């Protein structure tokens, strides 16, 4: 008799995705982050659901409802901090996952890669909407500053901003709609994630060498299920350590002050995971130019498959490209640091140089290094 997992219509899908899936035998721990992102999404949806049961999306009660969750709801404090720090863990896993894709040439699976970029944008939108909900100072002013960027769009800009606000400033209508967006987007992310996996399973996984591994595949279960469980345990350990010992490490103290439209915080800045893009935005003195650079800093990922000039897919055997890749990582860390600093000397010039280097590395230096490496192969 054939096993039920291979015949049942629903179990067959799960079986082909998680059990009998042929997987390259040599994929490293950098391939663990896909499953960790799935775990992040489940954690965020569950904790978010329980928070939504007690939260009120109204300007007069939003801040106190979060305080009520932390003080009066059974284990509300841990649910709230798991959700806040879970978002940080989500972005850590996300950036490592993208970095892995860049290093090993996984972007050559173009459909998977483009859905991934769409996922990144959706997750960023969700995180931004979520940051507004506690209605602290940074929530209010962050929402004001970021939504105001749309006013840089010629002709329709200011109308568009007022349409998103639902009035002439960030107010009750804005908070209510941001709560609605924040609630619905994770389910859209889940749907996109399924499409992402669907496209991935059309081609199979890439591997560190970048060479097709069709002749050397092993079943996903038990080899990679056990590996993913180890990754998941380490992830849970990190998240719980962060939540229980340093819950406010990655947050902004200003968000413990209730939103006040009459008092602007000294330094308006987004959460740490947006600081690199914020630094690029700030480094251009022109408003529209800054907004375009901000968009391009993320959307540049879409063009990476087109910028592939190397004859080798992976960077495993390409020392020049490796050097430039790690320079890019250092540059992104520099941008993240600058984004959290006040707009004054020397941070302005450092931010501008780091922003130029970011685009230069991706658009010019890395494709050029690949061409040089191709020439060296002939020696």
Curated annotation (Swiss-Prot):
Any one annotated GO CC term: mitochondrial inner membrane
SUPFAM superfamilies the UniProt entry points to: a domain/subunit of cytochrome bc1 complex (Ubiquinol-cytochrome c reductase) (SSF81648), Transmembrane di-heme cytochromes (SSF81342)
Cofactor: heme b
Gene Ontology BP, a term: mitochondrial electron transport, ubiquinol to cytochrome c
Binding site for heme b b566: 97, 196
Coiled-coil features, chain-numbered ranges: none
Keyword entries, A-Z: Electron transport, Heme, Iron, Membrane, Metal-binding, Mitochondrion, Mitochondrion inner membrane, Respiratory chain, Transmembrane, Transmembrane helix, Transport, Ubiquinone
Binding site for heme b b562: 83, 182
Cofactor notes: Binds 2 heme b groups non-covalently.
Topology of this chain in the membrane: Multi-pass membrane protein
Gene Ontology molecular function: metal ion binding; ubiquinol-cytochrome-c reductase activity
InterPro entries referenced in this protein's UniProt entry, alphabetically: Cyt_b/b6_C, Cyt_b/b6_C_sf, Cyt_b/b6_N, Cytb/b6-like_sf, Cytochrome_b, Cytochrome_b_C_euk/bac, Cytochrome_b_N_euk/bac, Di-haem_cyt_TM
Subunit: The cytochrome bc1 complex contains 11 subunits: 3 respiratory subunits (MT-CYB, CYC1 and UQCRFS1), 2 core proteins (UQCRC1 and UQCRC2) and 6 low-molecular weight proteins (UQCRH/QCR6, UQCRB/QCR7, UQCRQ/QCR8, UQCR10/QCR9, UQCR11/QCR10 and a cleavage product of UQCRFS1). This cytochrome bc1 complex then forms a dimer.
Similarity-based family: Belongs to the cytochrome b family.
Note: Heme 1 (or BL or b562) is low-potential and absorbs at about 562 nm, and heme 2 (or BH or b566) is high-potential and absorbs at about 566 nm.
Known role: Component of the ubiquinol-cytochrome c reductase complex (complex III or cytochrome b-c1 complex) that is part of the mitochondrial respiratory chain. The b-c1 complex mediates electron transfer from ubiquinol to cytochrome c. Contributes to the generation of a proton gradient across the mitochondrial membrane that is then used for ATP synthesis.
Name of the protein in question: Cytochrome b
Organism: Phocoena sinus (Vaquita)
